[in-house]
Amino acid sequence: MMLILGVDEAGKGPVIGSMFVAGVVFSEEDIFDLAACGVKDSKLLSPTRRESMERKILSIARESFVLEVTAQQIDDLRMVMSMNEIMVRAHSRVVSRLQADRAILDAADVNAERFAQRVREVSGKPIDILAEHNADRKHIVVAAASIIAKVARDRSIRDLEAALGRPLGSGYPSDPATVRFLKEWIEENGDLPSFVRKSWSTAQRLKASSV
């Protein structure tokens, strides 16, 4: 029985919160069940639909794993490596954690072939690894992983908002609600919270303008 691993991330670009890299393993036969459930790229689904889809995906999957990389970890790692290399390490961790004959990744590098090669090297897994741009639209196993990762990311933002009692927006630098939250937090506390990526230019600019 051929086992195929799909891997995708959610939260690479936000200034607020963790990044999540999800891996899900399916047999070739399971792909028919995924298709019957209507699995597609997470960006094409509403948050409610993603959550209901998550339960179906996990009930079909042979194995799954979600790696969380916190804002603090990203800041620390960026002092010694590029964001591309962080993506390689995170995807490698997921690939090495799960058992499959083949892995398909959504490429997190402009050079998809180089990304696959680096993940293969770092993971140390002797399996076939394919990385493609927009793999979540081309391969249903990657679409499934994108849903799992996105739900984990959405859930973490909701949990943060509940703990703080205030809206964070999407967490992306382009979101006015996110920028407003950061400005208000700096005004009130004089610094940025631990769940913000302080190495992001948006965070640095807002912090500098408050001095």
Swiss-Prot record:
<dbReference type="GO" id="GO:0004523">
    <property type="term" value="F:RNA-DNA hybrid ribonuclease activity"/>
</dbReference>
<dbReference type="Pfam" id="PF01351">
    <property type="entry name" value="RNase_HII"/>
</dbReference>
<keyword id="KW-0540">Nuclease</keyword>
<feature type="binding site">
    <location>
        <position position="8"/>
    </location>
    <ligand>
        <name>a divalent metal cation</name>
    </ligand>
</feature>
<keyword id="KW-0464">Manganese</keyword>
<keyword id="KW-0963">Cytoplasm</keyword>
<dbReference type="InterPro" id="IPR001352">
    <property type="entry name" value="RNase_HII/HIII"/>
</dbReference>
<dbReference type="InterPro" id="IPR020787">
    <property type="entry name" value="RNase_HII_arc"/>
</dbReference>
<feature type="binding site">
    <location>
        <position position="106"/>
    </location>
    <ligand>
        <name>a divalent metal cation</name>
    </ligand>
</feature>
<dbReference type="InterPro" id="IPR036397">
    <property type="entry name" value="RNaseH_sf"/>
</dbReference>
<dbReference type="GO" id="GO:0003723">
    <property type="term" value="F:RNA binding"/>
</dbReference>
<dbReference type="InterPro" id="IPR012337">
    <property type="entry name" value="RNaseH-like_sf"/>
</dbReference>
<dbReference type="GO" id="GO:0030145">
    <property type="term" value="F:manganese ion binding"/>
</dbReference>
<protein>
    <recommendedName>
        <fullName>Ribonuclease HII</fullName>
        <ecNumber>3.1.26.4</ecNumber>
    </recommendedName>
</protein>
<dbReference type="GO" id="GO:0043137">
    <property type="term" value="P:DNA replication, removal of RNA primer"/>
</dbReference>
<dbReference type="InterPro" id="IPR024567">
    <property type="entry name" value="RNase_HII/HIII_dom"/>
</dbReference>
<dbReference type="GO" id="GO:0005737">
    <property type="term" value="C:cytoplasm"/>
</dbReference>
<dbReference type="InterPro" id="IPR023160">
    <property type="entry name" value="RNase_HII_hlx-loop-hlx_cap_dom"/>
</dbReference>
<dbReference type="InterPro" id="IPR004649">
    <property type="entry name" value="RNase_H2_suA"/>
</dbReference>
<keyword id="KW-0255">Endonuclease</keyword>
<feature type="binding site">
    <location>
        <position position="9"/>
    </location>
    <ligand>
        <name>a divalent metal cation</name>
    </ligand>
</feature>
<comment type="function">
    <text>Endonuclease that specifically degrades the RNA of RNA-DNA hybrids.</text>
</comment>
<dbReference type="GO" id="GO:0032299">
    <property type="term" value="C:ribonuclease H2 complex"/>
</dbReference>
<dbReference type="GO" id="GO:0006298">
    <property type="term" value="P:mismatch repair"/>
</dbReference>
<feature type="domain" description="RNase H type-2">
    <location>
        <begin position="2"/>
        <end position="211"/>
    </location>
</feature>
<comment type="similarity">
    <text>Belongs to the RNase HII family.</text>
</comment>
<keyword id="KW-0378">Hydrolase</keyword>
<keyword id="KW-0479">Metal-binding</keyword>
